[in-house]
Amino acid sequence: MMIKKNASSEDFFILLGFSNWPQLEVVLFVVILIFYLMTLTGNLFIIILSYVDSHLHTPMYFFLSNLSFLDLCHTTSSIPQLLVNLRGPEKTISYAGCMVQLYFVLALGIAECVLLVVMSYDRYVAVCRPLHYTVLMHPRFCHLLAAASWVIGFTISALHSSFTFWVPLCGHRLVDHFFCEVPALLRLSCVDTHANELTLMVMSSIFVLIPLILILTAYGAIARAVLSMQSTTGLQKVFRTCGAHLMVVSLFFIPVMCMYLQPPSENSPDQGKFIALFYTVVTPSLNPLIYTLRNKHVKGAAKRLLGWEWGK
């Protein structure tokens, strides 16, 4: 049977997920649920703090709250479906559901790539052009940059996901993944998918390599500025904020590069599942910890919110 772009609403896919390791499904369910709850709690905590505490009404925390919201949405677009599949025999997803999931996973992933570039630019201006920071990072401009990240992500995803579902999928409907994503869907095709694979490589290069190059360029300039600093306190502050952002960048870009910067035909399905599991489950849960563990401003805001700060 052939599934085309005009498939009926009764069509469905079977998400194989981790069914090759049935003995691990219970363990995976518990571990993934814990990480998912950590993601929800940590990122909601940052969003609430950034909104209610006036001390955090700065460009850095505005972008951080946007990143937290992106992480929440990105994780929620795939993990609840995975948890349901791990705990029950029903592992299907409707054709429409698969389209929607693919669209949001791509959109939110691309938006996060762009937003991480914006955050690195914010740090560059703060360190390299501190006297012009309030002018260059005006609240209106910050809102425009954040909105641009979302618009770019959702626009490019609409084009790319449409191109993916135009490919005729035939035979079985077994998606060897735990969510609908491009390489896994292309493996179901009964036609030559080299054009789609090339498109995926080009899109990945544009929205993975170019943002990464821009981020590294910004931090190269920051490193030169830091080396010329005389103040030890200033050095420590820069290393704390920039080091946290670089760690988040590494946790996001390294697995994404391993996942998308090679043709789907050369990518091991099992390897791809665990790489995807890392950047959809582990990374979003660690980001709040990375940004807050040694951050005095966030700790102070948390104390004020919880009423733990005494007058001085």
Swiss-Prot record:
Disulfide bonds join 98-190. Changing residue 146 to V: In allele 6M1-6*02 and allele 6M1-6*03. Changing residue 218 to T: In allele 6M1-6*02 and allele 6M1-6*03. Changing residue 74 to Y: In allele 6M1-6*02 and allele 6M1-6*03. Residues 51-58, 122-140, 221-237, 294-312 are cytoplasmic. GO terms for cellular component: plasma membrane. Its main location: membrane. The keyword Translocase does not apply. This is Olfactory receptor 2J2.
